[in-house]
């Protein structure tokens, strides 16, 4: 009996070894046609093998799942615009910290270097509105003069930026990250910024500026090839595409569902039991730490009460206005300041009834479907796309779904009409964007990640910032999988 058992084990081992050997020897061969991958003598169909998923710099990988989105506490003077709803979000990445002043100054500096001489009006689009610090009955001029520009505030969150500016920043970040990835891979050469002094504006936007979509879709756009540029016959072509695994997906603002899911950081215990119903991004019903070492310390930057900042040396939240983006303890996903410090823009259009209307999976209101603008066709019949003022492919709207299934009559009020029902709030329309999280000037109620407010996408405030997100391509990088 024992000999038979050993024989079976030996046969099984040989079969497994043969399977692994076959797979190893046929990694470069199509499993459906038998033709070789990555064969220059053939069609040169490139298949990236052994790709290890890289987490984008400064981001945290968040595994998606289902959770109960919506109100966790009731406030009688606030409208019930966040009724509970069970939804599911897919896996994504999110910035560990809020975008800081130094992050934004990098963006502003790039815009100034590239467009400062040829198109100075474009540079103004990257400048935050420092006037948001002004209040009629407060002396905030030092913040107006220094908050954005002084190195002492480098790691403080950027404020005074509109939703539109935040979206532009995400697009700029996508292009800069992908440009650097191609440079490091030796596919293209680094841009020569010194050449901008004598370069006309059209050459800058058409040829000098790297844009991810322009690189992928515009056949006439050919950056200078790098040391590892791919050869095709006698021609040196630096072009790669997303299948090469070098470039990243688009940076963007998180959807409201993603932001709330990330803020609560709902995880299971060792028995795979998930406890929902958290009020804040941390455990418990209080805003103070309860562990012995940090007992009594406040866990977020907010206003506890009028005239209740604390006294010199023992300020209750250790911040007068905003605080550094790495202040306080992170939540269970490793994200900092998901409550307090500054409110954060999300991608969604605001509607009081959104929770009743949106889809169960990847809930979102605000879809605007677009297509690239075609300028002409080249001699091969390929489409030549129009390039916009920032050097990106221009697009046109094909379908606007921001008001899709919208029962709210306020959404149909003209922009120049005042909402007489509540003069303290802006009119609700397709430009109303949600911000969440609470800030340095908010009371504790707004620290609940389920609370939501809105502002016109072209307006800014000294307590609203943002962080970026990115859809995850493939599986989440995991060191430990569930049983």
Show the residue positions of the predicted features.
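Extracytoplasmic
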Residues: 57, 64, 84, 89-91, ...
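Disulfide-stabilized, aromatic/cysteine-rich ligand-recognition loop
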Residues: 23-44, 48-50, 75, 149-157, ...
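C-terminal, low-complexity/hydrophilic appendages and adjacent surface loops
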Residues: 77-82
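Short loop/turn microsegments at loop-to-beta-strand junctions
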Residues: 57, 249-250, 329-333
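Mature N-terminal segment immediately following signal peptide/propeptide cleavage
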Residues: 54-71
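Active-site microenvironments of metalloenzymes and redox enzymes
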Residues: 24, 92-292, 296-297, 347-353, ...
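A short, compositionally biased domain-edge/stem linker segment
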Residues: 40-55, 232-241
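Bacterial Sec-dependent N-terminal signal peptides
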Residues: 1-33
């Amino acid at each position: 009996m024992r000999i038979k058992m050993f024989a079976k084990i030996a046969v099984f081992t040989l079969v497994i070894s043969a399977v692994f050997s076959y797979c190893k020897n046929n990694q470069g061969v199509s499993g459906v046609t038998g033709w070789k991958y990555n064969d220059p003598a053939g069609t040169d169909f490139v298949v990236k093998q052994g790709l290890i998923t890289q987490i984008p710099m400064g981001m945290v990988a968040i595994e998606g799942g289902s959770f109960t989105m919506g109100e966790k506490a009731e406030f009688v003077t606030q409208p019930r615009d966040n009724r509970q709803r069970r939804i599911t979000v897919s896996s994504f990445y999110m910035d560990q910290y809020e975008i800081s002043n130094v992050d934004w100054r990098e963006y502003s500096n790039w815009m100034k270097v590239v467009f400062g001489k040829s198109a100075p009006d474009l540079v103004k689009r990257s400048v935050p509105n420092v006037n948001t610090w002004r209040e009629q009955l407060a002396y905030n001029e030092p913040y107006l003069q220094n908050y954005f520009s002084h190195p002492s505030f480098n790691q403080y969150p950027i404020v005074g930026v509109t939703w539109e500016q935040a979206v532009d920043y995400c697009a700029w970040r996508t292009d800069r990250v992908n440009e650097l990835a191609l440079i490091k891979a030796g596919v293209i050469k680094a841009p020569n910024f010194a050449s901008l002094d004598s370069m006309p504006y059209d050459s800058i936007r058409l040829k000098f500026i790297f844009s991810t979509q322009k690189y992928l879709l515009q056949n006439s756009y050919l950056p200078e090839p790098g040391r590892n540029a791919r050869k095709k016959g006698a021609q040196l072509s630096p072009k790669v595409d997303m299948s090469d695994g070098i470039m990243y997906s688009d940076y963007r603002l998180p959807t409201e569902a993603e932001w709330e899911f990330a803020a609560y950081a709902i995880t299971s215990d060792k028995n795979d039991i998930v406890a929902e119903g958290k009020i804040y991004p941390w455990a418990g019903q209080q805003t103070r730490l309860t562990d012995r070492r940090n007992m009594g310390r406040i866990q977020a930057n907010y206003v506890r009460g009028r005239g209740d900042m604390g006294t010199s040396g023992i300020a209750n939240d250790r911040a007068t206005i905003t605080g550094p983006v790495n202040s306080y303890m992170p939540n269970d996903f490793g994200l900092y300041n998901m409550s307090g410090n500054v409110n954060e823009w999300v991608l969604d259009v605001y509607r009081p009834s959104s929770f009743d209307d949106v889809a169960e999976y990847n809930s979102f209101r605000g879809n605007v479907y677009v297509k690239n603008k075609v300028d002409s066709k080249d001699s091969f019949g390929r489409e030549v796309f129009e390039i916009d003022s920032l050097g990106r492919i221009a697009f046109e709207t094909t379908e606007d779904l921001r008001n899709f299934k919208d029962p709210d009559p306020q959404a149909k009020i003209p922009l120049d009409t005042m909402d007489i029902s509540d003069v303290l709030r802006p009119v609700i329309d397709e430009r109303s964007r949600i911000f969440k999280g609470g800030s340095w000037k908010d009371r504790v109620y707004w620290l609940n990640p389920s609370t939501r407010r809105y502002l016109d996408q072209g307006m800014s405030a000294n307590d609203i910032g943002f962080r970026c997100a990115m859809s995850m391509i493939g599986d989440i990088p995991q060191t430990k999988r569930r049983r």
